[in-house]
Amino acid sequence: MKKLFIICSFDCSYQYYAETVDQWVKEQGEGIVLDYDLVKINDHKSHSFYTVSSLEEFVKMLDTEWAKEWDKANNCKDIVYKLEIVE
């Protein structure tokens, strides 16, 4: 299980972005995305936290033809960080 933090900027509205992420997780994330939270920073930026079962499988979700086309159409840019617990 991996924890991720993603900074995302986009040209579409935040509402459309959030609806698309919800749909994407439901359709492609079963068994991969265990939990996620989106945080609206402004109308064109979001921070999100994901718990995923496999980093490799999550990266494949980001790299599908559908995801690439959506990113291009909405000028969506992601910066993905892997989080680790400090003990």
PLM feature spans:
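Short S/T/G/P-rich N-terminal loop/turn motif that feeds into the first structured element of a domain
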Residues: 1-68, 78-87
